[in-house]
Amino acid sequence: MIEVGEYKVKEGLYYTKDHEWAQVLEDGTVLVGITDYAQKELGDLAYVELPEVGKEVSKGDVLCEVESVKAVSEVYAPVSGEVIEVNEELSDSPEKINEDPYGAWIAKIKPKNLEEELKELMDAEKYAEYLKTL
């Protein structure tokens, strides 16, 4: 884990400038969630609007929304593909994202163009450097 001030960045994941993370699983699917920075900036999460299974997304599209006591924030797809699973636990317990932002994934995507799109994402070190500029 890399620490940047009060924020934690998990190694082995890919990151966007909008503070989503992507984890490539052994079967080639991708878990998506929001970073420690995002959950701390939002504050206590009250609701996660999960995407629909079967939804086709392009990289940068709105995947879903998360609602906190402070704001409603859009979560963007870090990769293109089809949503094949959602983390139903978050429907009843959105605070799991606050407790464990890198464990509480939001959706699993079957990617369409993974190799190309990963090149456009940041690794943990680059994301940590990016956080220092905010």
Swiss-Prot record:
Cofactor: how and how many bound: Binds 1 lipoyl cofactor covalently.
Keyword NADP: no
Gene Ontology biological process terms, A to Z: glycine decarboxylation via glycine cleavage system
Gene3D superfamilies named in the record: 2.40.50.100
GO CC entries: cytoplasm; glycine cleavage complex
A Pfam family assignment: GCV_H
Source organism, top-level taxon: Archaea
Residues with PTM N6-lipoyllysine: K70
Function noted in UniProt: The glycine cleavage system catalyzes the degradation of glycine. The H protein shuttles the methylamine group of glycine from the P protein to the T protein.
Family stated for the protein in its record: Belongs to the GcvH family.
UniProt protein name: Probable glycine cleavage system H protein
Native species: Pyrococcus horikoshii (strain ATCC 700860 / DSM 12428 / JCM 9974 / NBRC 100139 / OT-3)
